[in-house]
Each structure stands twice: as C-alpha cells, then as structure tokens.
C-alpha cells in the first residue's frame, strides 16, 4: 500500500467506526513525539494520540468524510499530504459538520505507511 492508499484507508476507517490508532507511528527516542491536531484538541506523543483516537471512536458515530482535493507527494520513506475535507459526525446526540483542511506527514516503517504528524483545522471566512 502506498501513502495515498493509506490516507484513503484512514478515511474509510473513520467512516466505518473502525480503529484509527493503528495508523499512527510509535514514538522513537531519537525523535520528537508524534503530534495530532484535531478540530478541538492537540495530542502529543504516540500514546496520547492513540488513546485520543480510541476515545473518539468510542464516543462518536455516523461519520461523513468527503475528500475534495487530496494531494500527496511520496518519496522513499516519507510522504506528505493536504486535503480539503467535508467532515461530519454524531456525538452526544448532536450532529457536528465542518469544512476542514488536513495536512500531514507519513513515514514508511516496517513495511507500512504511518502518520507521524496530522493537522486538521476548520476553514473559516475572515
């Protein structure tokens, strides 16, 4: 699977309520920690990111993920991407819907592509 396919697989897993934590790399002692910024949180360190994603999967449902402009560049062991994503989900009896911007970095480790950084922000007019 290449980096683009990994990103599509992540989107599909989000839509279907499947585990997301496995898409993220473990921290390495020689590197700074993995970071994931979502619409409402910033998680630092692989353990925090993975627990945050498990909590998200447990507390949300009915995800809509509409990728509108995925752009991926892949090199030997690193890839980066950006996307414009329509995002919606149910949580606590309330529907949340946002136009979001995604960017991130993946690294090829042990035969798989894993996120080492992910940033999701809400697009707003000024």
Q: What is each model feature region?
A:
Residues 21-70:
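A solvent-exposed, acidic/Ser-Thr-rich amphipathic alpha-helical stretch
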Residues 1-19:
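Short, aromatic-enriched amphipathic alpha-helices that serve as compact interaction elements
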Residues 65-67, 82, 115:
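Hydrophobic residues on conserved beta-strands that form the core of alpha/beta folds
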Residues 88-96:
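Short, cysteine-centered beta-strand-loop-beta hairpins and adjacent loop/turn segments enriched
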Residues 53, 67-72, 85-87, 100-108, ...:
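Hydrophobic/aromatic beta-strand elements that line small-molecule binding cavities or substrate pockets
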Residues 80, 97-126:
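Short beta-strand edge/turn micro-motifs at domain boundaries
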